[in-house]
């Protein structure tokens, strides 16, 4: 649905002057995701692209991997006591015969807009085996100068951020820097799920020759989502976590952090970057 922003009264103090004015805020509402009729998770998200979000979430969980695994996604009617539809509950039905991994039964069912899914049973439980190994053949060969341009392209494509200043963004780019898709959400993990879910709905998985760029940091969960979708390159404008770096090294994911102008840190998978012209120094 279209409830992306809301208006609220704010008291503004600037240069000693006080005024009252309406302000535009990003909407944050819960979304319950059900799998074959059974509650699975609740995430705090910005409404919009809810079906894609649910599909992308299930890709990261190893439930869905290709378009044929998905039978249907619907909003659940009667979500309130009076029977009205809040458009905050979706039910994903898998195609008969699609295997459902046990990991879906082990999670803490609450997620937040900042950290994503919390309280997994163990680290091993999150290292779900992907059906899309990172096997880009021939390997991508990306010019670092091209990567350096992507944050500005991401920022220019953010529509709601300009009005609220409160949204994260995730975008898919080709290896040549062409913007394929962008999604905004109060949670960066939701923005990634919306991208991946839309790709699944369009039968575009695996995303084997694209670059995923995220605003903010690169957490373990975002690295996992990239791997589960077959994305070979994850770049972030801020820092990665240690677990994200470990996962990238294990799976062959190219992980770039602190992507700001001509500067960047490459934490894993440097074989996909054209570093021939760079001057190598070690400390």
Which role fits each region the language model picked out?
Residues 1-170, 174-175, 179-182:
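Intrinsically disordered, low-complexity regions enriched in acidic/Ser/Thr/Pro/Gln residues
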Residues 156, 160-216:
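Glycine- and Gly-Pro-enriched alpha-helical subdomains that act as flexible
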Residues 189-278:
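Feature captures the catalytic cores and cofactor-binding loops of soluble hydro-lyases/lyases
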Residues 281:
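Catalytic domains of riboflavin
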